[in-house]
A protein has these predicted regions:
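Secondary-structure transition/capping motifs at alpha-helix termini
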Residues: 80, 91-95, 131, 163-171, ...
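A conserved beta-strand-loop-helix scaffold within acyl/acetyltransferase catalytic domains
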Residues: 38-143
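Conserved acetyl-CoA-binding loop of GNAT-fold acetyltransferases
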Residues: 1-2, 188-199
């Protein structure tokens, strides 16, 4: 099992006047979700979605997932993931503080399936997932516990994932939609060659 360890200095924002005190250093570990799919569902699945709710709560437009929705997502989707592409970050007490979830792009497979929900429609999807994947990877999400944000946890996840991408033959990565004002996630792309090739806009018009 590949494990990456990083010492993080956490600035506890307890200030006396303008003085900031560093109170402690914690050790965190980044490793693949080295579990069976059953263990992933039972042990980490709920933790991952709870972490998402906590990490994304301040973002505009985010609506927290209910327990019923979480159970449905775990049941429906976790079995499709390659757990090598699901790095988790835990603290010294094995508490989840960060996670990244990526998977092979299914865009071409869905085009070949033409929306068919028969066995013939699922064959291209299964082929792309388990036999011959695309050169593109879809970065579905990255979530970090709020008190660890801005401390390099996302860099730890990326430093684990990039060698895995190379090993598995991926050449390009596509991120999910991101808020332009979410500077924390936008700034992580400064270290990579990247292109912003899609932009969405929503407008409102008062009706009198």
């Amino acid at each position: 099992m590949q494990v990456r360890k990083q010492q993080l200095e956490l600035d506890m924002e307890q200030q006396t006047g303008s003085k900031k005190e560093k109170e402690y250093v914690k050790t965190v570990y980044c490793h693949p979700a080295n579990l069976t799919y059953m263990q992933m569902k039972e042990e980490r699945g709920k933790q991952i979605f709870d972490l998402m709710n906590e990490a994304y709560a301040p973002l505009f437009g985010y609506s927290a997932l209910s327990d019923r929705q979480i159970d449905q997502y775990i049941k429906s989707y976790l079995g499709f993931l390659d757990l090598r592409l699901v790095p988790v970050v835990v603290d010294e007490k094995d508490q989840l503080i960060g996670v990244g979830i990526v998977m092979p792009s299914l865009s071409k497979a869905l085009q070949r399936a033409r929306g068919a929900r028969t066995i013939f429609g699922y064959i291209p999807l299964a082929w792309s997932l388990f036999v011959h994947h695309a050169k593109n990877i879809d970065m579905l999400l990255i979530a970090v516990k709020p008190e660890y944000q801005g401390r390099g946890i996302n860099a730890l996840i990326m430093s684990y994932l990039i060698p895995v991408y190379h090993k598995l033959g991926y050449e390009f990565a596509e991120s999910n939609p991101e808020l332009e004002v979410n500077n924390k996630v936008q700034s992580q792309w400064d270290y990579f060659p990247h292109e912003n090739h899609k932009r969405r806009r929503a407008y409102q018009k008062p009706i009198e």
